[in-house]
């Protein structure tokens, strides 16, 4: 038994020594080189157009249809979980025409796409301050969108792996009472 132990003990140490490099390998990575698991803060600027259906309540208790261009920004955090991404975001926008201000919060879930892109769906709560005879309103907001990085659209090498991404999104306020398409530039870091 002692002879077996004297043989197994050095072999055990040898096995541990040989396995150590495999255990010390880098963590899992996404296709763009960022960690597959972690926390990714971001911020961005956006522009869009918000158009309310004339049959809506809230902003549209008066006759007519509220609508207006928007310019704003957003900030949030993504938490990649392998191919799935979950996160939270705050937004704010200055409106023109019938909308004075919009601001809100959303949570989102998405799937990584391409080298550095993401397809996502989101839901949250939005406050809208109207003007020109349209009142204020607050309600749920739902939407979906896509983000694409430089490599995904043929501009590889333009920014670093975690750099600027183009965002295309569409949202609806109070379950299909409005439509809000938007375009944004998102900076991940």
List PLM regions with ranges.
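Gram-negative bacterial Sec-dependent N-terminal signal peptides
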Residues: 4-24
């Amino acid at each position: 038994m002692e002879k077996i132990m004297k043989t197994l003990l050095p072999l055990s140490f040898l096995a541990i020594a040989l396995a150590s490099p495999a255990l010390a390998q880098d963590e899992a990575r996404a296709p763009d080189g960022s960690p597959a698991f972690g926390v990714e803060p971001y911020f961005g600027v956006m522009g869009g157009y918000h158009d309310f259906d004339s049959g809506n309540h809230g902003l549209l208790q008066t006759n007519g249809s509220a609508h207006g261009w928007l310019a704003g920004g957003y900030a949030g955090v993504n938490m990649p979980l392998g191919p799935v991404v979950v996160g939270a975001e705050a937004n704010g926008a200055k409106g023109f025409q019938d909308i004075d201000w919009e601001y809100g919060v959303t949570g989102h879930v998405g799937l990584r796409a391409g080298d550095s892109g993401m397809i996502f769906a989101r839901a949250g709560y939005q406050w809208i301050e109207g003007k020109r005879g349209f009142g204020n309103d607050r309600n749920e907001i739902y939407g979906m969108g896509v983000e694409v990085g430089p490599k995904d659209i043929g501009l590889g090498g333009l920014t670093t792996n975690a750099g600027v991404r183009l965002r295309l999104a569409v949202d609806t306020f109070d379950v299909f009472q409005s439509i809000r398409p938007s375009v944004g530039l998102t900076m991940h870091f």
